[in-house]
Amino acid sequence: MALKSPAFRRKFPLLVTGGLLALQPLATSFVVAAEQFDCQVSAAGGWDCKPKATGNLPPRPVHPGAAAASSGAEAPGEVGEAQAEKPMLVTESKGRGLKSRSEDYSHLDWVPREKLTAAQLAETGPYCGGAYIEPTRPGMNDTTPKDESPTYINAKVSKYQQEQQIATLAGDVVMRQGSMQAEADEANLYQAENRGELKGNVKIRDNGSLVVGDEAQIQLDTGEARVDNAEYVMHKSHIRGNALYAKRAENAIIRLKDGTYTTCEPGSNAWQLKGNNITLNPATGFGTATNVTLRVKDFPVLYTPYIYFPIDDRRQSGFLPPSFSTSSDTGFMLVTPYYFNLAPNYDATLYPRYMAKRGMLMEGEFRYLTKSSEGQFGGAYLNDESDDRKLQTDYKKERWMVNWQHKGGLDERLMTEVDYTDISDPFYFQDLETDQIGVEKRDFVNQQGALNYRGDNYTARLNVHAYEMATISQITPYDKLPQVTFNGTLPFHPSGLDFGYETEAVRFERDLKNDLVFDKDGKPDESIGVVKDANGEVIGGRRIDESLRGIARANGTRLNAAPSISLPMEASYGFLTPKLKYVYTHYDLDLNSRGQAQAAQDSANPAYGTYNSAINRNVPIFSVDSGLYFDRNTQLFGTNYRQTLEPRLFYLYVPYKDQRDIPLFDTGETLFNYASLFRDNRFAGTDRIGDENKLSLGVTNRWIEDNGFQRQRFSIGQAYYFKDRKVQLPGIDYRTRKDSQSDVSPYALEYEYAFNRDWRFNSDFNWDPDSRSTRSGSAMFHYQPEDNPNKIVNLGYRYRNDTITYDSLTGAWKVGGGDYGSPGDANYIKDYYKIQQHDFSVIWPIVPQWSVIARWQHDYNRNRTLEAMGGFEYDSCCWKLRLINRYWLDYDDFSQATPTNEKGDHGVFLQVVLKGLGGVVGNKVESFLDQGIQGYRTREEQAY
């Protein structure tokens, strides 16, 4: 029975309760005690109460620690037995749920796994024995403010003492107001104090949380409550704990005295936080605790005076889980991140990073998101205490980094991009780590800004792109200051013709270094050569930029225009597209007297050109691309397929144009594969347009199931050349390059096979019929079931001996695998650029909750291991542990000779993740597993 509050509820909220209780016996068959009253609301707004006949109350329900009592006489033995039964304290449970309240922990809304529905199982971790499921109840989703919500009370028996203004309830007592509900075996409600006392099997529910206890005090007008000997549950977050007492504030904040916090199952005490005072705030999604110990199996393993932790997936300001590690570069390192939740659309994180060998590095980032843009600012500063590099050229004691990344739209057509990073010295990323998102450790860091405009039939782009060196073993690249492009198609198509155009204007500049170089010991770096004084004494090492000669040292402006006309003809059975393109390029070059003198010396070599300040190049390109499409329905091993046969014929003619006088600003030769058979330029970039007179033939075969799933794809092709390819990179003479004089290209093969959606195999293979040898090839096998992504197997092999490389020691381009340096040089390595490697990785469950993790990457060319690691993972419902032993090749610039900077390193890595709290140690494990094992990120994203 329920009655809504009268108008004066705020002043006398218990009057309703008293009246409700007094009225309850009229609607039940229970006999009620003497001194009970039947009460009705009078016409004047007061209460009209009449005494009822006397009678004995039925016995109160017995609960742990409570003696049965009644207004009548009872047997002394019964009273004694009840009084002797004392409740078990939560502190005696050692982090587990109280079995004395329910053997199956149902008092915590725990539902065993076998009783969960399919939808509930989908939200439950694979190694969890069940889940906390909030039972459906009236008002559980009520959002009405409490001061506007009526109060509903139900009980088997009720009694009201009008003079004392006390209402007594017994038997399945339920009080509900808005979304909050209180349950108990019995209750006393005090009208004068707006207060209630609950006894026996107390449960207080509100907004996905549950507090269970022996007794409780509740403020009926505000919802404030105190529950003694309490256990609590937050259902969606899989959080539970206990406390000597729990206080629930009016705003639903829960405060625990001598409380615990864990995400483990009720029967597990694998880990828990135990603190003097714990506060859980469902409104913010975060909790705090003071004087905290992290306990594993009830043994303390870590202490902190304060901790700030999440209780759901929302953002909030506070400390993030710390991480610590050790390495030869930094020594012991401790990172204690602090997160600032400044607004829903922007935040910041501070990363104080203490390194025993280097001092305190302060790093931070600020992220923003607006209706039209997103990005981040970041910075870091360290006054380096390490002396390892103090004598090395380019080293700075005050080390810093700044970075800005931005993407935005000024309107629906105009877009902006910024990718800017600056560092104090080229050794920054080799010595120091960063936690900033999007900052990559590469040989060069970008300093780029761009403005893009998209029209209906064209795109325009203004780009400024510079580089900052993050190594001393690479040549300084060209900056584009600026670059303007304008590409598109004409909006009309007379007789089916398509008209297109590509235009570019760009300025290339770089400042080549020519100062002396010294290594970390202060000695001349002799890897590239030495500089001597007039007396023949060595005074320092040569810069790697000094290996550049002649026109390779030039700066310049490049203007390029490439209009085209094509006639695409398409049908369901095939296509035919003749195309004519005309490429005009103009160069204005700047070269100092030293470079001009070197260019004059090199001009005697047919592989090099001469210097001209102004160069014009005109090259027509004619191509015909065609293909047919055949398909049929077939069946294999009982499965229906649509089998296709797709032959393709491509003819390309590009006349020879001498381009030896043009420097390479942004151009290189592409690697040969099946796709290159159908390109109109074998170079990537504008500075070289390869002469061609060839006919390429390829064919593709596919097997496609009725549902669109491609089971298999096989492609094979070859090009037939009608003349030699004379255009080459500087230093390469086509007359000494066999594949430039061959009449046919290598056979190019590609193959893909999907055993099912879990097993995949990919391969490519290029075989040279002239040398009867393999030019390049790879094979990759990947297994990861969709229904169990915890299983991963990768096995791959790569071989390549046709790489076009630049040798910084000689300043020349080389064909084939390529040696580093020349025979007789101190740092000479034969076939340094040849690739012959295998890569095997696996993550595999061996028994429930235990998985092995391994990777082995081996270089057969130099008979060395590039990376090897092995370990195991233990995963449970509430915590995860990984222990991995790892060997890898590290790179550190101690000289300008790339091979000498490679060194083996070794480490043992431990990662512990407390689910619901975060990683305690070993967060670095995530990075090398993600980079080294294909499928690892998918596995983690789908993990509980």
From Swiss-Prot:
Residues 52-102 are annotated as: Disordered. Keywords: Cell outer membrane, Membrane, Signal. Residues 1-33 form the signal peptide. Pfam families: LptD, LptD_N. Together with LptE, is involved in the assembly of lipopolysaccharide (LPS) at the surface of the outer membrane. The lineage of its organism: Bacteria, Pseudomonadati, Pseudomonadota, Gammaproteobacteria, Pseudomonadales. This is LPS-assembly protein LptD. The gene is lptD. Belongs to the LptD family.
